[in-house]
């Protein structure tokens, strides 16, 4: 997985939440014995919809986002294009990622290839506290975690002093499973 993945964990927005980073640290540091050529991917970070950015260079082609859009939302915006080591994730031509559950692809991406425009480079996850709650967006009562800026008093410059940084879904098999609609997810500004 690390052959074509950039080792830029210190500047990656997914640092601290990245599954690949966790596996890398748990199962031994990558020490290549040969000089391999990295496959060049497309543009560094591109907007694929009103809420999500795609950094194809970081994508490990796990296809979780493709399956989510095909099986859960049934909108099918994503696809894997080209073949072999030139394969890339992208949205189908003429489409953009704009469905009611588009923010969930950021949660299921294991490596930070898909990032949330609202949260991108605003705050590091190790500065966040988490509180269990219920989504204020509608009457469905989705279970959520409120991620707040717990370092606000010591570091007021982080995210311009905002308290609530984001809302993320919390698993509840009877109500919302693992998912959360964008109305609730991006309503965090009204919670603050």
Ranges and model annotations:
Residues 1-144, 155, 163:
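Fe-S ferredoxin-like electron-transfer domains
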Residues 35-38, 158-161, 168-192:
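Cofactor-/ligand-binding subdomain signature composed of acidic, glycine-rich
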Residues 81, 147-151, 191:
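Short beta-strand micro-motifs enriched in acidic
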Residues 144-148, 169:
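Short beta-strand elements
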